Amino acid sequence: MAAPGEALTPQGYIQHHLTNLHVGEGFWTWHIDSLFFSVGLGVLFLWIFRSVGKKATSGVPGKLQCFIEMIVEFVDNSVKESFHGRNALIAPLALTIFVWVFMMNFMDMLPVDWLPWLASLAGVPYLKVVPTTDVNITFSLAIGVFVLIIYYSIKVKGVSGFVKELTLQPFNHKAMIPVNLLLETVTLVAKPISLALRLFGNLYAGELIFILIALMYGTNLLLSSLGVTLQLGWLIFHILVITLQAFIFMMLTIVYLSMAHEDH
């Protein structure tokens, strides 16, 4: 990092924006900024939806209530179309995942320097404001889904049914049990890994593009003008990206849990 009062090089600027505020080292490193924004946005989500739910009226609803009802109906329809079991938890879980992941993704729409600059005034050297650009956060979400997959697989099918699913598919012969176990284990473990890395990769790349565009403002008038156009264009396109990634994470969660409820 550059010394106080010294301008960052382009490489240093990029590295600075991609570094988390953290404590500890190695495996025991805590990314304070990722935890703060993810938990804070989760609490904000609960507060908004609880407040709207308590004030909901059967009369003419307000704009916020209409918006919330539209989201709830959209998620509920998605669950009905993709989840083929019976579980009252799935719809609330899907709603939580969709809105929470979207809110974390939406932090990427803020100008890359605003919050880090404000934090620097308080003596905070680093601040990453997009939790889903931290692979630890995306893996935490994916592992939570993975635990539910295992739990419902055993609950619905029983321990013996779950073991049979791992050992007697796709080849229903005892001699193929080792091959089946290897294939099914890889398939099972790939679910949380793909969930986590897909979300992380798309948001990390999006954040990096915003950072690269921001570098153009410190060059010359021509590139600065081009930077404004590029930033506006990428901002509009990125609205689709952050929404789509939240939707994909939600839909894959619904599909995986639906598969866990299937009793072969």
Swiss-Prot record:
Name recorded for this polypeptide: ATP synthase subunit a
GO molecular function: proton-transporting ATP synthase activity, rotational mechanism
Keyword Cell cycle: no
NCBIfam families assigned: ATP_synt_6_or_A (TIGR01131), PRK05815.1-1 (NF004477)
Gene: atpB
Species this chain originates from: Shewanella sp. (strain ANA-3)
Transmembrane annotation, as ranges: 29-49, 87-107, 134-154, 177-197, 208-228, 235-255
Keyword Transport: yes
Localisation per UniProt entry: Cell inner membrane
GO cellular component terms listed in the entry, alphabetical order: plasma membrane; proton-transporting ATP synthase complex
InterPro entries per record: ATP_syn_F0_a_bact/chloroplast, ATP_synth_F0_asu, ATP_synth_F0_asu_AS, F0_ATP_A_sf
Record lineage: Bacteria, Pseudomonadati, Pseudomonadota, Gammaproteobacteria, Alteromonadales
Recorded topology in the membrane: Multi-pass membrane protein
Keywords carried by this UniProt record: ATP synthesis, Cell inner membrane, Cell membrane, CF(0), Hydrogen ion transport, Ion transport, Membrane, Transmembrane, Transmembrane helix, Transport
Family under the similarity heading: Belongs to the ATPase A chain family.
Complex and partners: F-type ATPases have 2 components, CF(1) - the catalytic core - and CF(0) - the membrane proton channel. CF(1) has five subunits: alpha(3), beta(3), gamma(1), delta(1), epsilon(1). CF(0) has three main subunits: a(1), b(2) and c(9-12). The alpha and beta chains form an alternating ring which encloses part of the gamma chain. CF(1) is attached to CF(0) by a central stalk formed by the gamma and epsilon chains, while a peripheral stalk is formed by the delta and b chains.
GO biological process: proton motive force-driven plasma membrane ATP synthesis
Function description: Key component of the proton channel; it plays a direct role in the translocation of protons across the membrane.
